[in-house]
Every structure is written in C-alpha cells, then in structure tokens.
Regions:
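Acyl-CoA-dependent O-acyltransferases
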Residues: 1-240, 244-499
Length: 499
C-alpha cells in the first residue's frame, strides 16, 4: 500500500501535526522543553522495550463488552525505517540492541548525532541533553553547504539512485547508518514561513501565534520547500519532532510504519507531561560529554546535480499544494450524537451531498477504517457513494437551479428539448431518505472496522494472483473497477484533545 508507491514522501504520504505553540523567553527555555520531551520519549521507549504498554480497548460489536486492540503499531513505530528502492521501497526493521540509542538533530540543514545511552553509564541526564541541544542551537548557517536532506523529498526511485551514489563513500555510509538507526529526528527550525505563504490571510482565519492554521500546517507538512525549511528534514525516518523559531511545535511522520492515532496520541500525551512540569532549576552542572557529532558528507558532482534536481521538483510539489481550513461553529459533534447519528457518517454524507450539488453526481471517496481489532490490522476503506446517499442527495437538490443545470449537461436530451423539474419530495420523505442513507453508511463503517470491508480482500486476491503467476483477474481490468477506485475525495479523521 505504501512501499510500492513511487511518489515523493512529503505531501503525498507523510502526515503532519501542529500542536499549540510554545512561548520561550530564552533559547535555553526552548532547549529545556526539547530535552524534557525527549526524556519522556525515552521513558516511553523503555515501556515499549519491556512490552508493558497498556492495551487499548474499544466496545465490541455487540456493544456490551470491551475488545482489545492490536498494539503492534505502537511497538514498531520507533523501530522502522523506510529505505528507498528503484522498484519499491524497503521497510527496515531495526534491532533495538543496536538502534535507538542516539537522536539526530537537524539545524540549518545540517545533521548532528547525540548519543542518549551508553553501555558504561546508562542514559544521558536531562541537564546534559539541554547542554547538547544548546551547542547545536549555537551553530551558524553555512549557505555553501549543500542541503543533503532535500534528497529525501525526491520521487522514490530517483532518491534510491541518488542514495546509491552517496553510498560509494565510507563517510556517507556512516551518516546514513546513523540516520537509519536513530530514535528520531528533531528539527530545530531557525526560520518561519512568511505569513502569506501559499495562502491569502483572512481576518476570520484561526491563528497560532502570528500565523494562521494553514501556515503552520504547511510548516509541518513540508517546511516550505527548499527556499525555507524543507531540507531541514529526513523524511525517510518515522518520527520528526519540529520546533520553530517562533515556538511552533509539531511533528511529521513516515506513514508506512503505522496509522495516525498510534503516533499522534503519543506525541500529544508526552507534550502534556512536559507542559505539566515545574520550571527547571537555574543552576546547571557543566557537562563533559563530547560535542554532538556533525554529519559531514562527501558529495560527488552527480550528487550535487541530484540535490539541485531535488530542490526544483520539491518546490514544484510545494507550490501545487493549497491548504484551506474550515472552522465550523454552528453546532458540534455532540449535537449530531444527540440525534443518534455518528459524526463520521454525518460528515461523509455531507461531502457526498456537496459533491452532488456542485457536480450533479456522487464521487468515489476514501476514508481509512482502523482494523486494529485484528492482529497486525492497519486499515480498510470506508466508501460513501451508495444508492441511498444518491437518493437523498437528489431529493435535497430538487428545484435547485444549479443541479438542474448539471443534470441537463449530463443528460442526452436533444437540442431544444426542455426538461421539466417537479418538486415531489416532502420534508418528511427527505428525512426518511436521510435516515436510510445514515443506516447504509453506518453499516459500511461498521462492516469495515469489523473486518468485512471489500478493499483488503480484493487487494489480497490481486496480489495472490501475481504471486501465483496467474493473469490478473478480470474484475481488476473492468472499467467500473477503475471508476470506483479513482478517489477524487480522500478523507480521514484523527481525534485528539488539543485543538
């Protein structure tokens, strides 16, 4: 589902999350915040290493008992690295005895390795980590140094070839191994995106500090491309913590390792623990640890050309992305639930209705359905374009001039023929049709999360035929199959406690 897709990771695959921004009066305060977050992350990693993470539970299908969820995604999130390949990427499963003992920091497009564990002394202290972070924060930008991190923004086959070129030098091999085996990447961004980046400002927009929500989402998704912070990343690594110059706090993660809830909720919980801590003591004990190891690269002319190509292609990708945010306040999900309707079902039907009103037809829609009720379960696809949704949308649009125009364009009426539109649906009948659409969509949602969706089964059939050397089954070459799998709308939701 992920590893065979040749597209670039940022925007196309890696999700981003922007949390509430921080306020720091000094650089040291920012370093303390990062050190405390990373200390909590190390604590969390030790819980994972001891296999003692509390098992999450949800209501079972009968609604009376609780059912455990598979926790594999939590345990593998910090043990996976996505390595590019020409014909398909490789998911590297890291050995915990030889990985996760150092953290990579990105600053001014340069990378630094900081050991956080040592066999002879155990874990680094919070105070020592603060001092290491301050050393990195004190480094200066060097515009002459090529931004190697930009290579991870390339299409995967191109990045695989560029990586092969890097591997020709021993020092580069050492650097790539450090990046693969680190616990995570921490991006210290000494810049912010311009306030109007890719979006015209509006007074009614929601703001985080001096930037609107769309701006900070651009920041965590792609960093603004090569002209801003896009090279201060290593997108192949599963987890990036991102701290902006203005206190912007967020994350970016590589999607093949797991789904959003497994990493977003952990990020949120660790951040809340740090926020609840008291201010640190002013006195610090000088550290005698070696300075952070800067990753020095040996770049051939071919690699320099690859970097230039990556900058151009990444900037083109970034410029093609628009982010628009609707902050709806007329009513909340509690109002929807009070009518015994799932908010998820409600939104999916609203999207189908909107598309029908705009274009005169429903649309193939993808929504991920978590299937962690099953061992190693990831997702299946909740679809929303149903006959019941169509009947309700048509009833809602009766007498709508725009809809009549769309239907006229989609019909085969001869020139000069007039279409007569009658209003035949009462409000009561429209409500009945809506109830039927809700029932159908609710069943679709429940079928998927309980393992009765169609997409995973069909995908299994297709791959089984390939592995057996058999022809592709006819269903996969049928025009109808192509239509229902062209998702003009891709939707997802991840609940969290932090607005």
């Amino acid at each position: 589902m992920y590893l065979s897709v040749p597209l670039a990771l940022p925007i196309n695959s890696n999700p981003g999350l922007a949390a509430k921004s921080r306020t720091f009066s000094t650089q040291k305060e920012a370093a303390v915040f990062l050190a405390r977050f990373l200390t909590e992350l190390l604590n969390y990693q030790e819980v994972l290493d001891s296999s003692s993470l509390e098992v999450e539970q949800v209501k079972s299908k009968d609604g009376k008992t609780m059912q455990p969820l598979c926790m594999a995604q939590h345990y593998q999130m910090y043990r996976i690295y996505r390595r590019p390949g020409i014909k398909g990427d490789e998911q590297v499963i890291l050995d915990r005895t030889t990985s996760g003992n150092h953290i990579i920091f990105a600053h001014h497009n340069q990378f630094y390795s900081v050991p956080v564990r040592a066999p002879d002394r155990g874990r680094i202290t919070e105070d020592e980590l603060v001092q290491q972070i301050l050393k990195i924060m004190g480094t200066k930008a060097d515009p002459r140094t090529p931004p190697v991190g930009i290579l991870t923004t390339m299409k995967r086959p191109a990045w695989a070839k560029a990586r092969d070129e890097l591997l020709k030098h021993e020092q580069n091999r050492h650097n790539l191994e450090l990046l693969e085996r680190c616990l995570c990447v921490v991006c210290i961004d000494d810049d912010i995106l311009p306030a109007t980046f890719n979006n015209s400002l509006k007074k009614e927009d929601r703001w985080i500090g001096d930037r609107d929500y769309a701006n900070v989402l651009h920041h965590v998704l792609h960093g603004g491309g090569s002209r801003h912070l896009g090279a201060n990343r290593w997108f192949d690594k599963t987890f990036h913590a991102i701290l902006g110059k203005d206190g912007m706090w967020g994350m970016n993660y590589e999607h093949s390792a797991g789904e959003g809830p497994a990493i977003f909720i952990t990020f949120e919980e660790l951040t809340e623990k740090v926020d609840a801590m008291s201010p640190p003591e002013e006195n610090t004990v000088p550290s005698h640890l070696p300075a952070p190891e800067k990753l020095e690269w040996y770049l051939s002319e071919q690699t320099l050309n690859d970097i230039r190509d990556a900058m151009i292609s990444f900037d083109t990708l970034v410029e093609d992305l628009d982010i628009c945010i609707l902050w709806f306040q007329e009513y909340s999900k509690d109002f929807i639930k009070s009518h015994r309707i799932s908010p998820d079902v409600y939104i999916q039907l609203a999207l189908q209705f909107t598309h029908f009103r705009l274009h005169g037809n429903l649309v193939a829609t993808y929504e991920s359905a978590g299937i962690r009720r099953f061992a190693l379960g990831r997702v299946d696809c909740i679809r929303a374009a149903s006959p019941e949704a169509l009947a309700w949308a048509m009833a809602m649009c009766q007498g709508d001039p725009e809809n009549q125009s769309a239907n006229q364009q989609n019909s085969n009426l001869e020139e000069g023929t007039k279409r007569v539109q009658f209003t035949i649906y009462s409000e009561e009948r429209i409500k009945e049709l809506f109830d039927l659409a809700v029932q159908r969509q609710t069943k679709e949602m429940n079928d998927n999360i309980n393992g009765h969706g169609i997409d995973n089964h069909l995908m299994g059939l297709r791959y089984a035929a390939q592995e057996a050397g058999e022809p592709v089954p006819d269903i996969f070459t049928d025009q109808a199959y192509k239509i229902v799998n062209h998702f003009a709308l891709s939707t997802s939701q991840v609940s969290n406690n932090n607005k």
